[in-house]
């Protein structure tokens, strides 16, 4: 006997899953986005040991605070997130490896970052590819060759690294050097600048940018003199730390190592540590895997690049390089945000102790 069907019973069961699953997915995405937003407001302090077997006792446990790719970001009022985190940290010098300005060229956040350290430890910095040119002819003010943000940073106590700077520790020394000086043929560069200077002087005196160009050339000649003097002063026992924005590739390192300039030239093989940035840790990272993609401008461009070539410590052709995960967001990536990638700064501790 067939059961009668109630007039009030639906012919088909409701498919509640068709609504629940999309809602759960939307909720999950909202939670991830919210957590990522909070995470990007934090700053993580990393610690790395760098082994230099010939390190002197004076430099054992010498610490360098490495910061990169600020991109004009401010973490708390007056960079209070960073200053609070570092309140009990110990370090002997601060190295900033470029991309310090905001996309619009403003640099207030950079100056506030310098103020966290200035007067306590030396602060060295180089410019990045997304910063305004640090040195350029100023037609309206020919006596100036440095960009406004460089001059302002120097007024706040930082040191623009256009030539080697010596930091003496006991009877030992650490030299902080611009990477651009390695492989530089000083004699040839000086000859080229002097020829250019002579050509400008022989031009008509009413050239509007003549004075500005001459000022830049004189500045570059003075930089060559300072590099040359520093190279002559450097001892084999000194530690050389090279600052660069773009990480050095294996090809670049091989080329610089093969450099056979005159005795007054600097050699990359004398460098104990290279500090770099630029990649922002890949910007978007896959948990437990690494960077999702390298920027198109990188030699290792592509999906899931080798992670120690994007961030962290590595040794290439005998050269130790540390690439900072950075703080901000680079225009080199199509997605303008950090994902699963906490903004980070690093304290690198020099040691003679081998670790296995």
List each model region and its residues.
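N-terminal Lys/Arg-rich, disordered targeting/topogenic segments
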Residues: 1-17
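Active-site neighborhood of phospho(di)ester-bond hydrolases with catalytic His/Asp-centered motifs
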Residues: 66-68, 93-99, 123-129, 161-163, ...
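Binuclear metal-dependent hydrolase catalytic cores centered on His/Asp/Glu-rich metal-binding motifs
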Residues: 135, 155-157, 170-243, 250-264, ...
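Beta-strand-turn-beta hairpins that frame and shape the catalytic cleft
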Residues: 51-65, 164-178, 192-202, 232-241, ...
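Acidic, His/Gly-rich catalytic cores of divalent-metal-dependent hydrolytic chemistry
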Residues: 8-10, 24-31, 35-46, 307-311, ...
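N-terminal active-site segment of His-dependent metallophosphoesterases
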Residues: 28-113
